[in-house]
């Protein structure tokens, strides 16, 4: 009798685990194949508006940069600002968004907008990593919670994206 109850108990646990794993797989799959949720879009738009207001108050200029959410990043790079043929574009990594949306909103968007501002103002330094003192100040002024360099100089892109 005890053996039968124990067997039923373990089978129940296995069934619950399989259901849990199936649900996680399904959620990950649907997130990957669909556009980001509207709640994410709103958070990105709200943060962008906050950054534009800070840009206007600190620098007397305000300009929007296209923000593209993509799953084409090869690594765990959170964001990237590309400057090519005079055009600036910010790319955000969809692959890390689900687990790090707060970080993306609190730090990454302003971090990337700081690069865009430095490009636009013509303050690019001779540093190859794109994280000069001017950039650091811009990052702080645009409201990033954390203005640190997260890539090494080999990963910085000036017109060449790490994906196709």
Locations of regions flagged by a protein language model:
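Active-site recognition of the HExxH zinc-binding catalytic motif
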Residues: 107-120
């Amino acid at each position: 009798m005890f053996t039968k109850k124990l067997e039923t108990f373990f089978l129940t646990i296995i069934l619950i685990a399989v259901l849990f794993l199936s649900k996680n797989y399904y959620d990950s799959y649907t997130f990957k194949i669909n556009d980001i949720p509207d709640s994410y879009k709103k958070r990105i738009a709200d943060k962008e508006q906050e950054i534009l207001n800070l840009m206007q108050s600190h620098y007397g200029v305000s300009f929007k940069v296209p923000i593209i959410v993509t799953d084409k990043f090869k690594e765990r790079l959170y964001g990237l600002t590309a400057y090519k043929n005079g055009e600036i574009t910010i790319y955000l990594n969809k692959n890390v968004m689900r687990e790090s949306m707060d970080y993306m909103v609190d730090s990454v968007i302003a971090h990337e907008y700081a690069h865009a501002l430095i490009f636009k103002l013509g303050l690019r330094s001779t540093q190859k990593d794109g994280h000069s003192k001017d950039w650091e100040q811009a990052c702080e002024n645009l409201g990033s919670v954390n203005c640190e360099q997260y890539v090494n100089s080999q990963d910085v892109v000036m017109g060449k994206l790490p994906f196709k």
